[in-house]
């Protein structure tokens, strides 16, 4: 979790989360990678993006897999293809899921910036860089 405030007071921690800017919220929608992806990329977790394939690990939809349809940074929730509930009038609506309850099983690597970011983070975990 990114450091939003130095305070230890729960009141101020909650306020910082509530008032967090969108660029900080992007890190708050991180999910763990599957063991296979972890081994392949050398990274433990990444922010969820639209197009990633995820598996729900907790809750009523545990075990469901699907592509991420939408990432709502304001509510800190993600919407997954196939994870829907039916309204009283019969129309299906996506069920918001917190990213901590999912595991990324397939990454959408269509973005070059994301590829570079993964390589940077993996190098940091390996101890690469210019330390002596």
Curated annotation (Swiss-Prot):
GO CC terms of this entry: large ribosomal subunit
Q: What are the BP-aspect GO terms?
A: translation
Question: Does the keyword section mention Signal?
Answer: no
SMART domains according to UniProt: KOW
Tell me which domain of life the UniProt entry assigns to the organism this sequence originates from. Answer: Archaea
Q: Which GO terms describe its molecular function?
A: rRNA binding; structural constituent of ribosome
Q: Give a yes or no for keyword rRNA-binding in this entry.
A: yes
Q: Name one Pfam family in it.
A: KOW
Keywords, alphabetical = Ribonucleoprotein, Ribosomal protein, RNA-binding, rRNA-binding
The record ties this protein, via CDD domains, to: KOW_RPL26
Q: How does it assemble?
A: Part of the 50S ribosomal subunit.
PANTHER family of this UniProt entry?
60S RIBOSOMAL PROTEIN L26 FAMILY MEMBER (PTHR11143)
Function of the molecule: One of two assembly initiator proteins, it binds directly to the 5'-end of the 23S rRNA, where it nucleates assembly of the 50S subunit.
Query: So what family is this one in?
Result: Belongs to the universal ribosomal protein uL24 family.
Q: What is this protein called?
A: Large ribosomal subunit protein uL24
Q: To which species is this protein native?
A: Aeropyrum pernix (strain ATCC 700893 / DSM 11879 / JCM 9820 / NBRC 100138 / K1)
Provide the taxonomic classification. Archaea, Thermoproteota, Thermoprotei, Desulfurococcales, Desulfurococcaceae
